């Protein structure tokens, strides 16, 4: 959430930033709401002050046995109480109107984010590794998985409908191995603390990270009103909600391997075959909580941690910076890491690393107190996939496929596979 004081002082900056995102100007509307609220707050405060003063005057009048004045003052206090009963309710309503309006405004892109309308305007930063030249026509992961007998979409549809997968045998173990490998890398070498968070959260948590109120259609809700997490970013970031974090403990770095649940409401007709776009999928998430001065450097560090996963797996990838029109709602800047999929002959996103500034910190009311200062500041937050486990499975299958349809297991994963070096067709 953006600061209304900052908006009052920088209306043109806000409107220019919204234009970069392809959105209409909103500063005048927000400032008008704020002025209406502030004017009303002024009237309420004046009435409260007069009520308190009149109440004291009643005591003085009674002490002086000036009953006429006392009765007039009592009548005035009664009128003020009646006014305040309605006015304070109106104040809460006006404050909510402003808060609701602010909650739908996206974050301000950093100055170095490239301008653009959609993913075609994203800018490639680097490529690591060269795509393998196969001596045969490489297959897509679902062709490989079904032929091996370890990937079952038909039974998954029987159980749950479209966009689900049943993995069996060594493919199920390979997905588990990938998640464990990523967690071990981030916790033992990258300094992240592993967390096992709830998979269901309250409204406040999903609001804090920015999925609510604007993107509720992308989420699954339980019958008792909780939300299935679309990413572990939600519970990990909200660990510090409504807290003042010790400055000496920053940055806080958390990681988790969790199932994620998404409705894919806007994805009709896209990636309908295979595991690329699922309602339920495994993902390793990284979250950092930092001070204002450290967040830019932390973004580069987090992205490097995600890239290291693919380097260790020997998977070709490229890193791009998203343009203003393709960034997520809460991001100031986002790097996407795209892995090479030979079956599709293209790069596909496997990790997205974003710095959010104090956007989420303000929504969560999460603060820190800089050393030597009395006042607090909102924390800066960052999140990144480290990485999407299902997509990593796809990438390993397609990049390590053999002409006979078997899958070679990358060396980094073999210790997690009980020494197995190849996945072959089920007997």
Curated annotation (Swiss-Prot):
GO terms for cellular component: cytoplasm. Keywords: Aminoacyl-tRNA synthetase, ATP-binding, Cytoplasm, Ligase, Nucleotide-binding, Protein biosynthesis. One of its GO terms (molecular function) is ATP binding. Its main location: cytoplasm. Homodimer. The tRNA molecule binds across the dimer. L-serine binds at residues 231-233, 285, 385. It comes from Brucella melitensis biotype 2 (strain ATCC 23457). This is Serine--tRNA ligase. Signal peptide: none annotated. CDD domains: SerRS_core (cd00770). The keyword Protein biosynthesis applies. One of its GO terms (biological process) is selenocysteine biosynthetic process. SUPFAM superfamilies: Class II aaRS and biotin synthetases, tRNA-binding arm. It catalyses: tRNA(Ser) + L-serine + ATP = L-seryl-tRNA(Ser) + AMP + diphosphate + H(+); tRNA(Sec) + L-serine + ATP = L-seryl-tRNA(Sec) + AMP + diphosphate + H(+). It holds the Pfam family tRNA-synt_2b. It is found in: Cytoplasm. InterPro entries: aa-tRNA-synt_IIb, aa-tRNA-synth_II, aa-tRNA-synth_II/BPL/LPL, Ser-tRNA-ligase_type_1, Ser-tRNA-synth_1_N, SerRS_1_N_sf, SerRS_core, tRNA-bd_arm. Pathway: Aminoacyl-tRNA biosynthesis; selenocysteinyl-tRNA(Sec) biosynthesis; L-seryl-tRNA(Sec) from L-serine and tRNA(Sec): step 1/1. Catalyzes the attachment of serine to tRNA(Ser). Is also able to aminoacylate tRNA(Sec) with serine, to form the misacylated tRNA L-seryl-tRNA(Sec), which will be further converted into selenocysteinyl-tRNA(Sec).
């Amino acid at each position: 959430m953006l600061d209304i004081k900052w908006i009052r002082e920088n209306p043109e900056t806000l409107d220019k930033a919204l234009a970069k995102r392809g959105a209409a100007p909103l500063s005048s509307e927000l400032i008008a709401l704020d002025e209406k609220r502030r004017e009303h707050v002024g009237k309420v405060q004046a009435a409260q002050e007069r009520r308190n003063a009149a109440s004291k005057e009643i005591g003085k009048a009674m002490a002086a046995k000036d009953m006429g004045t006392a009765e007039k003052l009592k009548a005035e206090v009664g009128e003020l109480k009646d006014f305040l009963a309605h006015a304070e309710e109106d104040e809460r309503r006006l404050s909510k109107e402003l808060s609701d309006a602010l909650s739908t405004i996206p974050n301000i892109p950093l100055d170095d984010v490239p301008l653009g309308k959609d993913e075609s305007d994203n800018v490639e930063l680097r490529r690591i590794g060269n795509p393998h030249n196969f001596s045969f026509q490489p297959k897509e992961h679902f062709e490989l998985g079904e032929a091996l007998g370890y990937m079952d979409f038909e039974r998954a549809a029987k159980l749950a409908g479209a966009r689900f997968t049943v993995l069996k045998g060594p493919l199920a173990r390979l997905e588990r191995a990938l998640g464990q490998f990523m967690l071990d890398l981030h916790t033992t070498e990258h300094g992240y603390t592993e967390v096992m968070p709830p998979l269901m959260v309250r409204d406040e948590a999903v609001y804090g990270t920015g999925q609510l109120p604007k993107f509720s259609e992308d989420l699954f809700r339980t019958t008792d009103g909780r939300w299935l997490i679309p990413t572990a970013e939600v519970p990990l970031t909200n660990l510090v909600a409504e807290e003042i974090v010790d400055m000496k403990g920053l940055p806080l770095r958390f990681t988790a391997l969790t199932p994620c649940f998404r409705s894919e409401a806007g994805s009709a007709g896209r990636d309908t075959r295979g595991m690329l776009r699922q309602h339920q999928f495994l993902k390793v998430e990284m979250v950092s909580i930092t001070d204002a001065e450290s967040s830019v450097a932390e973004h580069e560090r987090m992205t490097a941690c995600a890239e290291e996963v693919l380097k260790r797996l020997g998977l070709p990838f490229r890193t791009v910076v998203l343009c203003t029109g393709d960034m997520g709602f809460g991001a100031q800047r986002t790097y996407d890491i795209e892995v090479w999929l030979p079956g599709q002959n293209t790069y596909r996103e496997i990790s997205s690393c974003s710095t959010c500034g104090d956007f989420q910190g303000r929504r969560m009311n999460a603060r820190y107190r800089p050393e030597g200062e009395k006042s607090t500041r909102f924390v800066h937050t960052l999140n990144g996939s480290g990485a999407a486990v299902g997509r990593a499975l796809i990438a390993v299958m397609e990049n390590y496929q053999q002409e006979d349809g078997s899958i070679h297991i990358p060396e980094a994963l073999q210790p997690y596979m009980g020494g197995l070096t190849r996945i072959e067709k089920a007997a």
